[in-house]
């Protein structure tokens, strides 16, 4: 079984989403000793944001300048990693009400018409169903249902929308929120998220 582990936090060892996503991978590795894990650290090795040149350069039979071809190849590598994975674990912090730009750049490389989705007579159809996706969403404040800031949460909601669009309709999402509200709140949020990670079922 192949697992793709993607981290979008820029906070390194201080990151809650990284801590919990690593715990998830450890949990699944313990259940599946032969697990083949690919790791993509989007802070250490960010993908370039999409450009018009790259979109054109990704078309069949395109002739590209070396720098454009390098960018196209990076996107294809990210897409191939995603397509090959049976399980995808994503560390997704909430920055300024949405995902980190590094994680968004990765998403832009895996949402590819004709590969992970297509348009038909009835609209969009996801082509990447069948994968298990587990995401950790960390939030400094309180954005859960019923909170005053719930409508401003565009990390978990965006992830659910994007994943459903490509056919992954039942992602497992672990939320750690309130981590910026003081040391005790952070510890409670982290402990709860780690408990949820430890309780994940085998794939």
Swiss-Prot record:
A Pfam short name: Flavodoxin_2
Residue numbers binding FMN: 9, 15-17, 138-141
Keywords: Flavoprotein, FMN, NAD, Oxidoreductase
Catalytic activity: 2 a quinone + NADH + H(+) = 2 a 1,4-benzosemiquinone + NAD(+); N,N-dimethyl-1,4-phenylenediamine + anthranilate + 2 NAD(+) = 2-(4-dimethylaminophenyl)diazenylbenzoate + 2 NADH + 2 H(+)
GO molecular function, a single term: oxidoreductase activity, acting on NAD(P)H, quinone or similar compound as acceptor
EC number annotated for this UniProt entry: 1.6.5.-, 1.7.1.17
Cofactor(s) required for function per UniProt: FMN
InterPro entries: Flavodoxin_fold (IPR003680), Flavoprotein-like_sf (IPR029039), FMN-dep_NADH:Q_OxRdtase_AzoR1 (IPR050104), NADH:quinone_OxRdtase_FMN_depd (IPR023048)
The keyword Oxidoreductase is assigned to this record: yes
Keyword presence, Oxidoreductase: yes
Cofactor binding summary note: Binds 1 FMN per subunit.
Functional description taken from the UniProt entry: Quinone reductase that provides resistance to thiol-specific stress caused by electrophilic quinones. Also exhibits azoreductase activity. Catalyzes the reductive cleavage of the azo bond in aromatic azo compounds to the corresponding amines.
The protein's assembly and partners: Homodimer.
HAMAP family linked to this entry: Azoreductase_type1 (MF_01216)
Family label: Belongs to the azoreductase type 1 family.
Protein name per the record: FMN-dependent NADH:quinone oxidoreductase
Organism: Methylorubrum populi (strain ATCC BAA-705 / NCIMB 13946 / BJ001)
Encoding gene per record: azoR
């Amino acid at each position: 079984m192949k697992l793709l582990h993607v981290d979008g936090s820029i906070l390194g060892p201080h990151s809650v989403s990284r801590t919990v996503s690593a715990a998830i991978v450890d949990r699944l590795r313990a259940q599946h000793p032969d697990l083949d894990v690919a790791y993509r650290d989007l802070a250490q090795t960010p993908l370039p944001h999409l450009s018009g040149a790259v979109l054109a350069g990704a078309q069949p039979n395109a002739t590209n300048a070396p720098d454009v071809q390098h960018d196209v190849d990076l996107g294809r590598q990210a897409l191939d990693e995603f397509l090959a994975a049976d399980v995808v674990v994503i560390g997704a912090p909430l920055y300024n009400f949405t995902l980190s730009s590094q994680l968004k750049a990765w998403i832009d490389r895996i949402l590819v018409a004709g590969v992970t989705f297509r348009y038909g007579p009835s609209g969009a159809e996801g082509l990447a169903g069948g994968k298990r996706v587990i995401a950790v969403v960390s939030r400094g404040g309180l954005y859960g249902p019923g909170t005053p800031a719930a409508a401003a949460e565009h990390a978990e909601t965006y992830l659910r929308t994007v994943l459903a669009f490509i056919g992954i309709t039942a992602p497992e999402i672990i939320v750690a929120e309130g981590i910026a509200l003081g040391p005790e709140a952070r510890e409670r949020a982290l402990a709860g998220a780690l408990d949820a990670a430890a309780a994940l079922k085998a794939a």
